[in-house]
Structure formats: structure tokens, C-alpha cells
Amino acid sequence: MLLFLWIETSNEYFNFDWVIFLGTGYWFYWSIFILSLAGILTAYSSLLLLLGLLLLWEGIELYLHLCHKILILLVILPCVILMFIICKFWKERWLVAGLSLQIFAPYVHLVSITVMVILFWPVAIYVARLEREVRMRRYRMTHSEKKRLKKCNVIARLRGLQVAVGLPFLLIFLSLCLMPLGIYSPCIQEKENLGPKPTLFGHRGAPMLGPENTMMSFEKAVEHGAHGLETDVHLSYDRVPFLMHDFDLRRTTNIREVQPESAFKNPATFSWDFLSTLNAGKWFVKPELKPFYNMKPLSKADKERARNQSIPTLADLLTLAKKERKFVIFDLRGPPPRHPLRHTFVRQVVSVILASKIEQHLIFWLPAHDRRYVRSMAPGFQHVGHLVSVKTLAKNNISIINVDYKKLFPNGLRDYKAANIRINVYTINEPWLFSLAWCSRINSVTTDNIGLLSQLNHPHFFMTPKFYMFIWLLVDIISVLFIVAIFCFHWRRETIKEKLFETSSTLTDTQSRSENEEDLHIAMKPARVVESPWTLAALYPALSKSGKEHQGRFNFAAPSKKLVPIKNAVTPLKPGKHDIQPPMPTTVFELTQAPSRQAKSKATFQTTLPTLKVDKPTMPSVEVPYP
């Protein structure tokens, strides 16, 4: 905001530097310094914000170093102080910023639409990811009904985030699309309605081409086609009207070299004999004292000419204006107390003007003091008023006003135009302000930058309503298409990711079920799988015949609900006397650890039964439930 405000008020840079000079006595481009500082602070803050967004994008936790914290405080502190000063002592700058929107609002609209389209890319990514997260959570929710309420709360929060991000963006975008309906710009009009180019009054001559209020400056203004010449008039102690703007001689003369103790005195307290000896041009050649930062470099001839300038009298200016037939308008500075012309300074100036024999209609009489006397002595003068009501102007028979542009545009410009009152505004140096005055049908402007404004043949930022409507609709349609395309692209990409996730989840579930079944199958191996070739069933197959009738220990038969009582029909086996055989292995679940390969032996099952001699092996028809 500060940077925007300072850029748009570039027309006031000289006045800002001049006010600081009055307080400090030191000339410096403070306005450019503040502009540079605001630009650096804005760039630093923007880069820091961009870096933070990129880190958040990558999922990296933010950590602000102490140096950055200090710098941020240093950014905020001067901005707050400067904004307070502007709001307290320089409220007119806000008026300038408002006027700039009358010119730049159509272009701000087009740029804002483009920026919103660019910003929609991350917004679309975020909204699409939230949608994918919602769907994935819903998919998971079907597998866990116990947590349904909690999941619903999470989904509601995700939907809320979507609305919180997407809805404001859409509202802002729609507002920008409809913004031209509320835009008023004087430079959007038909070509046939455009008024003539305002005439130019050289403010103190041409202060960008020569030392202000010197004959060189006025001659430069005439060379660049000035319609009139503007100046400020003081009266010396010996009654000679001379040209000087400031209320002391420090800035534009060498008074500090001649009489340092008199540097702060009012110029009207000096005699003309002394004032005529002062140099009024050497300061202009010094680089550190140039009044405008954007001045063109002077040629050697102009530098030499500027060094020899002195304070001119009002009679000198009237002679030039009479010769070139240029209008003259001036501010008349009243003498200080105890001055000989304290109450008659207006009559003295009128007598000097009449003595110059200049055509009276070339004088734009601006001072309001003793206007009745002026009308009686010089009826041909064109009286100029200030920013007062139309009724007051009509009562005083005034048809011209000279006003500050910052106060004119917000205060009834149409009323003055309707009353056929000619308007001169001051001081306009920027092309965009001159274009605004041109499109507003202002009659004349007072300017320091006559070299640039005299070259303009057409107002900047001018366009017809049909052309602007075409650009408006074209940009809106293209931006909507881009936004829809971006949203569809990210939506489709997140949908593909969601389908891949569902597919992988299904495969994972199927695979996990298969693994569980396989684990269960391994845990319940049938008898023939885990049976060792040294078991009874392997050695005596007859014992395992008729599986339906003889359910073994490892035969997985469904247990009957009713238990069959076990009959003691098995004859106990008795070992034979001479029947000594190696122990027969039987199947158990505990495996012995296999010996090392160096022993070259194999793992064997533990045996628990001794060698038995069986005459007639029989199996009872017993059905034992599986434990």
C-alpha cells in the first residue's frame, strides 16, 4: 500500500522535498529515498512470503531466523510511521491516489484478472486434494463403521476448508469480472467528445530547463510553446516588484556566501540594489541541488548561461510577455510588517504593469486583495478566482478559476463546466495527470515539466467505450476458460490418484486375506503333510484304511455334537522278549534343532515310544472331538 501510494503521488515529489528543506535547510531527494526504501522493503517482504509458501508447499516446517524477525520489525516500523505522517499531515496524497484510479482502474482490472487466474492454480490444487481426501476417507469409512461419526466430523471439516478457500476466491473473481460496471474514467469516451489539448502555463518558467524564476527559465518556457507564464512576486524594501518563490533566499541564491547571517530573512526586507547583486543560477548547476531528479542534463552553453542568472524584476517578465504575447499569472506575496508598502503593495504592482504597456487582457489577475481598485484602474485584466461556489464567482463577475488539481476533481468539476467557467489547474507534471485533465476538458494547466507535456499530442490511456467493452469481455471469457481448464485438470489428476489408491487398497486387502488364509492353512496341516515316513501309518498302511471309519488324530473331521463313549476294546501291547528294534519315530510338533553341516547329520524328530510287538493291530472306532 505504501509503495503504491508513493508511486502514484510522484507529481508531489518536489513539494515534499521542498517542505523538508524548509525544516532542515538541506536539499536532498527525500522522496526518491522513500520510494527506494519502500521498493526494497516490499521486495524483501514479497520474497520472504514467497519462500514461506514454497516451504509450506514442500511440507517443510517454517523457522524464521532472528535476523529476519528484526528485519521484519524494521520493515513494519517505518511503514507505520510514514503512514501516520501521511494520514496526519498529508491527507491530500490519498486524493492523488484516488485520482490515479480514474486513469488506471481499467488497467488495474485487466491485471487483476490475470493475477487471479495465476493464483487459481494453487487454489485448484488445494481444493482438488481436499476433495480426494474426502473421498478416500469415505472409502475407508465403509470398512470401519464403528468410527463413522468421527469420520463424518473429519469430512465436515474438510468440506469447510474447501468452502473457506474456494468461495472467497470465486467471490473476488466474480467481483473483478463485474468491476467495469462501477468504473468511471474520463479517458473512456468517444473520440468526438474529447476536448482540445489544455494550454500550458510555465510554472516559474521552465524549472527543469533553467533556474526557476529567472529570465532563462521563462525564455525556455516560451521556446517550448508555453501559452502563459506563472511566477511569484515580492516587493523589495525600496518598492521594486521582483520574482521569488520562497520566503527566504537560501535555496535559489548565493546569500549564504554573501551574507550568511541574512539567509533566513524575508526577501522583502532587502533593497533592490542588494538583491540585484545576488546570483540566482549557480545552485542550479550543482548536481546535489538539482530541484528535480528526472531533469535532463544541461549542455555546456546552458550551464554557462545558468551560472550568470540574477533575480529578475516583474518589469523584465512583462517585457518578455509583451514581446511574445504570452499570458502572465502570478501570486502576489504581501510584504511583512513595517514594510513601506504593507497596505499599498497591490496598487504599486498595478502601476508597474500599466507602465509596461502590456495588453491588459494578457494579465490574469489572481490576488483577491483590493480587487475593486484593480477593476477601476485596469478594466482589461482577466480576474481569476479560487475554489469557491459558482454563485460566489458569478457575484464577483469572475469566469476563470485557478485551483489545485487535488481539490478540483473531487469537488464539482461538472458544476464549473456547466457554468462555462474556465479552469486552470496546478501543478501538473506527470503525463497521466495531464491526460486526466485533457480528458476532463480542463482549459489550461500550470506545469514544471513543460518540455515533456508540450510533446504530447494525444492523452495517454485513452480508449473508446466499445473497445474497452471488447477487451473486458475478451479477458473475462479467456480467464473463465483458463480457470475451468485448470480446475478440470487438477480434478482429473486427483481422481486418477484416487482410483489408483482404491485399486491398490483392493489388491492389498485381497492379498492380506490370502496371506491370512495361508497362515491358517499352514497352522492346521493335515496328517499326510506333516507325517514322517517313520510313523505307524507309513509303516502299516492298513491302519489308515477306511478313513471314514477310522478318524485319526490328524484327520480334520468335523466333531460330532454327541460324543461316542470310548470302549476299552484295545488289547494292551506287550513288547516281545527278543524283539528289540530301534525306536520308531512318531510325529510331534517340536522339532529339534538341525546340527551343523560339519557333523553331516540330519534333523530328526524326537521319539517317545519304544519298540512294540503287535500281533494284530486294531483301531477302535472312536471319534474324538478336535480340541
Curated annotation (Swiss-Prot):
The gene is GDPD4. Residues 39, 91-107, 184-468 are extracellular. It comes from the Eukaryota. It comes from Macaca fascicularis. Residues 1-17, 61-69, 129-162, 490-627 are cytoplasmic. It holds the Pfam family GDPD. The keyword Glycoprotein applies. GO terms for molecular function: glycerophosphodiester phosphodiesterase activity; metal ion binding. PANTHER family: GLYCEROPHOSPHODIESTER PHOSPHODIESTERASE DOMAIN-CONTAINING PROTEIN 4, GLYCEROPHOSPHORYL DIESTER PHOSPHODIESTERASE. This is Glycerophosphodiester phosphodiesterase domain-containing protein 4. InterPro entries: GP_PDE_dom, PLC-like_Pdiesterase_TIM-brl. Keywords: Glycoprotein, Hydrolase, Membrane, Metal-binding, Transmembrane, Transmembrane helix. Its EC number is 3.1.-.-. It is an enzyme of class 3 (hydrolase).
